[in-house]
């Protein structure tokens, strides 16, 4: 399963155009979909997650859940993304063999090295720009991406990325970018997706 390109991370589920935005971006070419929801109760997350998984599979892209082994299990998602305050990598690796495990490595190259050795399927450095998605996001020096080519697993950039600043990241040998607001808050999510993909052709 290829892990590269444009990685869409959702906002928390909400009533309204949530699924329309996701499908519009998937139909425009998003390569990976992650369901990230920090606020809703599990019954809502499960219901929304099932619909998102169906959409991801409709467009033949991997479906990842954020930080929850419970959702990974119930939804039988393709994988999970974890950070420093989430369940331990080793537990997830043992409990869910064969699942994709992605790890946030912030601005710490040694974390990236550690998790590659432990068997992570991809890592994500960031935040590179101010982001409204995560108020307490640690800012990351863009020069860390000079090390991207040293890894044998995909390296993603994340955090405050939009169609105006993404070119700064594409100078480096990354595998892709992860975005939230740049698509969810776009006037035209499909057009924003296509703009990102056109720029990503430089590295794909």
UniProtKB/Swiss-Prot annotation:
Q: Name one GO molecular function term.
A: magnesium ion binding
> Which residues participate in 4-amino-2-methyl-5-(diphosphooxymethyl)pyrimidine binding?
34-38, 66, 104, 134
Q: State where Mg(2+) binds.
A: 67, 86
Annotated coiled-coil positions are none
Enzyme class at the top of the EC tree:
transferase
- One term under GO cellular component: cytoplasm
Q: Does the keyword Protein biosynthesis apply?
A: no
InterPro entries (UniProt xref): Aldolase_TIM, ThiamineP_synth_sf, ThiamineP_synth_TenI, TMP_synthase
Annotated residues for binding of 2-[(2R,5Z)-2-carboxy-4-methylthiazol-5(2H)-ylidene]ethyl phosphate:
131-133, 160, 180-181
One GO biological-process annotation of the entry reads: thiamine biosynthetic process
Pathway assignment: Cofactor biosynthesis; thiamine diphosphate biosynthesis; thiamine phosphate from 4-amino-2-methyl-5-diphosphomethylpyrimidine and 4-methyl-5-(2-phosphoethyl)-thiazole: step 1/1
Which reaction is this enzyme known to catalyze?
Answer: 2-[(2R,5Z)-2-carboxy-4-methylthiazol-5(2H)-ylidene]ethyl phosphate + 4-amino-2-methyl-5-(diphosphooxymethyl)pyrimidine + 2 H(+) = thiamine phosphate + CO2 + diphosphate; 2-(2-carboxy-4-methylthiazol-5-yl)ethyl phosphate + 4-amino-2-methyl-5-(diphosphooxymethyl)pyrimidine + 2 H(+) = thiamine phosphate + CO2 + diphosphate; 4-methyl-5-(2-phosphooxyethyl)-thiazole + 4-amino-2-methyl-5-(diphosphooxymethyl)pyrimidine + H(+) = thiamine phosphate + diphosphate
Co-factor: note: Binds 1 Mg(2+) ion per subunit.
Q: Which cofactor does it need?
A: Mg(2+)
- Under which EC number(s) is this enzyme classified? 2.5.1.3
Pfam families hit by this protein: TMP-TENI
Chain's role: Condenses 4-methyl-5-(beta-hydroxyethyl)thiazole monophosphate (THZ-P) and 2-methyl-4-amino-5-hydroxymethyl pyrimidine pyrophosphate (HMP-PP) to form thiamine monophosphate (TMP).
Q: Which family does it belong to?
A: Belongs to the thiamine-phosphate synthase family.
Q: What is this protein called?
A: Thiamine-phosphate synthase
Origin species: Picrophilus torridus (strain ATCC 700027 / DSM 9790 / JCM 10055 / NBRC 100828 / KAW 2/3)
């Amino acid at each position: 399963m290829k892990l590269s390109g444009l990685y869409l991370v959702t906002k928390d589920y909400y009533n309204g155009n949530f699924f329309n935005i996701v499908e519009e971006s998937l139909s425009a070419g998003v390569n990976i979909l992650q369901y990230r929801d920090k606020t809703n109760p599990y019954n809502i997350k499960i219901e929304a997650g099932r619909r998102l998984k169906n959409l991801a599979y409709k467009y033949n892209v991997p479906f990842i859940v954020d930080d929850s082994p419970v959702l990974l299990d119930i939804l039988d998602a393709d994988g999970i993304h974890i950070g420093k305050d989430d369940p331990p990598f080793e537990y997830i690796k043992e409990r869910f063999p064969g699942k994709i495990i992605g790890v946030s490595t912030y601005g710490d190259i040694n974390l990236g090295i550690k998790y590659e050795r432990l068997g992570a399927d991809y890592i994500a450095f960031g935040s590179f720009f101010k982001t409204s998605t995560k108020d307490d996001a640690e800012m990351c020096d863009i020069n860390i991406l000079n090390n991207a080519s040293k890894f044998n697993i995909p390296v993603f950039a994340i955090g405050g990325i939009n169609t105006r600043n993404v070119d700064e990241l594409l100078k480096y040998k990354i595998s892709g970018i992860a975005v939230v607001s740049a698509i969810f808050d776009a006037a035209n999510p499909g057009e924003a997706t296509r703009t990102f993909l056109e720029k990503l052709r430089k590295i794909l």
